[in-house]
Amino acid sequence: MLQPKRRKYRKEQKGRNTGIATRGNAVSFGEFGLKAMGRGRLTARQIESARRAMTRHIKRGGRIWIRIFPDKPISKKPAEVRMGNGKGNPEYYVAEIQPGKMLYEMDGVGEELAREAFRLAAAKLPIATSFVVRQVGT
């Protein structure tokens, strides 16, 4: 599962996920990409689940790049604990996703195979996505 090896601080404030992705919004490594159209949070488990779905579909061919990393800790209080007494412990990590962010990239496979693999991966994710092809000259 993806998570940071070390952090300066264990806990982080909630913050607001606004705006659109100005960085990491183009196909940079592969030939095809899965781009976020919606906004939200992807947990490390969701990222891994989508990766597995893609990897199983393309079998031994091709290469996959994961362009996002879950670096924000989400804390949670235990069940049946009264309010107060400080913030809960970090439970899992998420990646904050803005519209336009490239989530995954793929190369070394045909367009039909890539499209189907990304469709299977998108079914595992809680945000709207779209299939993109690298533009000529980029």
Curated annotation (Swiss-Prot):
What segments bear the compositional bias annotation Basic residues?
1-13
Cellular component aspect of the GO annotation: cytosolic large ribosomal subunit
* Record-linked Pfam families: Ribosomal_L16
**Family annotation (CDD domains):** Ribosomal_L16_L10e
Task: Give the residue spans that cross the bilayer.
Answer: none
* Keyword terms, alphabetized: Ribonucleoprotein, Ribosomal protein, RNA-binding, rRNA-binding, tRNA-binding
Q: Does the keyword RNA-binding apply?
A: yes
Summarizing the function annotation, the protein's role is: Binds 23S rRNA and is also seen to make contacts with the A and possibly P site tRNAs.
The record's listing under NCBIfam families reads: rplP_bact
Instruction: Name it.
Output: Large ribosomal subunit protein uL16
Q: Which organism is it from?
A: Ralstonia nicotianae (strain ATCC BAA-1114 / GMI1000) (Ralstonia solanacearum)
Q: Which gene encodes it?
A: rplP
